Amino acid sequence: MPELKTVGLFLITALAEIAGCYLAYLWLREDKTIWLLVPCALSLVAFVWLLSLHPTAAGRVYAAYGGVYIVMAILWLWVVNGIRPTTWDLVGSAIALLGMAIIMFAPRTT
């Protein structure tokens, strides 16, 4: 069950990062209100705090988190931007998740 908790934490962490970056994007590129920077900052602070909750060495967390981030970004592309992922987007996401699983859940002594 710790694996499920780890993956869930990665998903929430990725959502916080992507949402924060997207809010900044809306302000910078879509000419939306500067007030979007308030939830943007809160989201990015939550992202950093969530990263600190992961139960392994920071470098390993960052490496594995990248795989989950890719999947969440493709999901964001579909849900928020309304662009359906291609087969290659899905294949690449699956490979990234496999890499995350190997990094996080492989047996090790340290």
From Swiss-Prot:
The primary site where this protein sits is membrane
Q: Membrane topology per the record?
A: Multi-pass membrane protein
Subcellular location as annotated: Cell inner membrane
Against Pfam families, the record matches this protein to:
UPF0060
- What positions belong to coiled-coil segments? none
- Gene Ontology cellular component list: plasma membrane
Q: Please report any disulfide bonds recorded for this protein chain, giving both cysteine positions.
A: none
The name this protein carries in UniProt is: UPF0060 membrane protein Noc_2955
